From Swiss-Prot:
This is Transcription-repair-coupling factor. Couples transcription and DNA repair by recognizing RNA polymerase (RNAP) stalled at DNA lesions. Mediates ATP-dependent release of RNAP and its truncated transcript from the DNA, and recruitment of nucleotide excision repair machinery to the damaged site. The keyword Oxidoreductase does not apply. In the N-terminal section; belongs to the UvrB family. A motif (DEEQ box) lies at residues 747-750. ATP binds at residues 646-653. It comes from Staphylococcus aureus (strain bovine RF122 / ET3-1). Residues 633-794 form the Helicase ATP-binding domain. Its EC number is 3.6.4.-.
Amino acid sequence: MTILTTLIKEDNHFQDLNQVFGQANTLVTGLSPSAKVTMIAEKYAQSNQQLLLITNNLYQADKLETDLLQFIDAEELYKYPVQDIMTEEFSTQSPQLMSERIRTLTALAQGKKGLFIVPLNGLKKWLTSVEMWQNHQMTLRVGEDIDVDQFLNKLVNMGYKRESVVSHIGEFSLRGGIIDIFPLIGEPIRIELFDTEIDSIRDFDVETQRSKDNIEEVDITTASDYIITEEVIRHLKEELKTAYENTRPKIDKSVRNDLKETYESFKLFESTYFDHQILRRLVAFMYETPSTIIDYFQKDAIIAVDEFNRIKETEESLTVESDSFISNIIESGNGFIGQSFIKYDDFETLIEGYPVTYFSLFATTMPIKLNHIIKFSCKPVQQFYGQYDIMRSEFQRYVNQNYHIVVLVETETKVERMQAMLSEMHIPSITKLHRSMSSGQAVIIEGSLSEGFELPDMGLVVITERELFKSKQKKQRKRTKAISNAEKIKSYQDLNVGDYIVHVHHGVGRYLGVETLEVGQTHRDYIKLQYKGTDQLFVPVDQMDQVQKYVASEDKTPKLNKLGGSEWKKTKAKVQQSVEDIAEELIDLYKEREMAEGYQYGEDTAEQTTFELDFPYELTPDQAKSIDEIKDDMQKSRPMDRLLCGDVGYGKTEVAVRAAFKAVMEGKQVAFLVPTTILAQQHYETLIERMQDFPVEIQLMSRFRTPKEIKQTKEGLKTGFVDIVVGTHKLLSKDIQYKDLGLLIVDEEQRFGVRHKERIKTLKHNVDVLTLTATPIPRTLHMSMLGVRDLSVIETPPENRFPVQTYVLEQNMSFIKEALERELSRDGQVFYLYNKVQSIYEKREQLQMLMPDANIAVAHGQMTERDLEETMLSFINNEYDILVTTTIIETGVDVPNANTLIIEDADRFGLSQLYQLRGRVGRSSRIGYAYFLHPANKVLTETAEDRLQAIKEFTELGSGFKIAMRDLNIRGAGNLLGKQQHGFIDTVGFDLYSQMLEEAVNEKRGIKEPESEVPEVEVDLNLDAYLPTEYIANEQAKIEIYKKLRKTETFDQIIDIKDELIDRFNDYPVEVARLLDIVEIKVHALHSGITLIKDKGKIIDIHLSVKATENIDGEVLFKATQPLGRTMKVGVQNNAMTITLTKQNQWLDSLKFLVKCIEESMRISDEA
């Protein structure tokens, strides 16, 4: 974008602006948003000061940030994102927004140069003083001494939570001399202490818990945007007492008890344990001298104000909202007089003393004495939308007027295409920058702005893809912390006490923890399991691979099995029969498909390439991979049968559209079958829009078409005039004949009835089939289906999808009103989820009284199909502002303009339901909001409370996500394999079911499990060899280490585990050293064919297999074991060698030496 800033800074008009920009009370008028951003960016580039850009709300701040990223390095651009909503302080915070705020405050506190975008709400928000913030930014260096208690206290003050194992942002842990911290900014950090000295600092991976690189020093930023010290708590308690005493007599007697409870709950907090999320509500009472963000800026900072009058309007409504919000919480006994979240001074008072430049599109009256006024003439650019003639005449006008023409396109390929297009129009253009660019020609560069603009006085026009092709601007990637799926779904296999488990031989039990037992004078760790009645089972940790976590549908509570009964055997046999049947069915289908002859497509045509380049967004890697897999299938002679699986809004439709276009380009017809009329309409519109520039005839068959139109479409399919038909089950009627059907695309097949599914099966015959589903297919199942069903998975969301901001709140009409007003004020729409059909119309009336000007519709499952579809269609077409609905919206409907979801009684929903419902919003490039409301003061059932707790962790991270994924995976498995399988999955648990299915499929395909070259080794030694609780306190970590030891087969793996133990838990005690010795002995035994090593008191028995006996070189063995002398004796039993070792001092070392010698005495068989 250098060319643009070069052209601007050389112009006299900009130079006039530059002279007064940064002087007090300057007004700049006439600039469109993108033109304004270009000027502000150039001013910033030329100055050495901090620049503060104030907007009226966060939405505007986001838009300006996207454009500014084109000109300013992401490292120097900061945003202070505060929602335009009071309830934010009353709900679970989004870690993403919090980390952006912390990054901004830290940069300001360090006096860094930068361009800082702050919405009005952020400007007024109460904050910790800058001095306190600076005192709580820590830099740690190797070799420094720290006071550990003081350091840990400071972390708590900064908003960190102490956990036994660090797995989420904002946590820390202490194990021995190791401190782990996961800051909001940067990598997780591991600090190893030698007494009080920092011995080393390493970053580590939360997924593996292993250290990565050593670092010399690290900055630890806060985990909250408030600092809360003991002093702050003391001051807070005093202020709170006064506020309570002041409020109590002034409120209604009926709520005084509620106020007392609110006060008591806050009074309990001590600095050693408090929740920043809750205390932030009391920010007005925390600090003797609270600050705002303006106090963090340098005294010579420059301020730019975007649309002063709009800011004043927002300020007015913000004050009214804040007053009404605080009044409501006081009146309901949930708040105190004097409580507030923002500074009430006028925004002009806040920025007094700084030089302010005001930007306004129109010349306007302002209550400010202006020193300078700079007027620009700026015009919007004609919208061409691919219309060649209009484009050519407009470009010709620019050339004739000697304009500098800057064309911005988003990829290198598009630069070449654009140049070719301009060349056809005889418009001179260049793509490489020269020292100076002559006017009267176009320069085409990679870049993007939200809109184009024309500055006639400067002789400059900037044209973007939005005007050229109606493309939306791609949002720039910004340095937000990437949250990997692995981190989100850390592992639903984590075993917690009380979890249900499945033992391969004994069935479903309950996990009670790891216990160290003394058996025969030695200590060992066992997994303790509870079965039916008082039955208990202790499983040695070295047999833990027989125990899996029981994973089934969310609402499924399994029945415990009885130990020693036949019930479990019967259950397993039933499931075994079922998986064998399904495996056979899958194999038969697969063989049938392999034998079938389909149409073999050629390589992509030139039209295909052009069509794909017209897609206005970057494909995600998963989309690109799925498209390649589908094209590979189409280019084979056997018919395709592929399942494309991806979350709602992850871009499955574009993948399907490309496959459809490929089929049409080779003269084939495409049928696109969808479960509902509305989806048919939406897919039809997408196809029309995507293929408008190509000779493709697309028709729709649904209730929205007249009988005459349907008759014409049927005729067109028969004659071949229609290339693509989109439709509901109407497409399945027997009187429809295709001239040459080549591709059938089925969306959400599981939503069709049995009769329709049968008809789909007949349609599939010898035709390529692509099935789309939004329900995730679990990876384990994916693996067991390899070679039987072709699956493509899209797991990554498109780049410009913002994470949905999720709030968990008590039900309160003022919260609801605020959320509704905020969405409608940005011309958006709202889903209001109310799942009681009998009183849904009363709920609509209640909301209508709250929002008299809003158009409110109702949708529920008891309406006729026609009424429901018409209501939904009106909502999609923006005829209603709010849709009060039941869970009927859970699947399928795409309403890009609806970006707020409010769910009443969220505690009654399953997590997977909430996850899917939340996917309804945040579908466009706007931020989506989801409010999960639960009744105030309601006594929740234990399950609802657990669920609510999980929902509270349902922001970007947290276990709520894991549980939702787990339940959806099981639903996905049911959809893939048939509903009756769902029941079988629930009886034996998901993992065991997947394992049984995989074995059955492999057996039917004749693939034998590779038998281990070396048999299983049993090592039984009378030694205290285990992981003591004093060394590893966290049971999950303990189980994880035992699992790794159980799977160890090489010495490299042993070294790796030793490193991990020292890395994560510090130096290990003698019990752990012995455990590692036993694993080392086992590895030698594995490699040398030893089957048993048993401690018999005074001697140790060692048994070799017959095969190992044949392979051993006796001479080499006897020579190598001479140092053992007479303590070792050799014999033969049933053609297999046995060795006894008499125990003496250091017998464990002797045993290690002996098994190593046995391994080294093995003859290597000639395979070459």
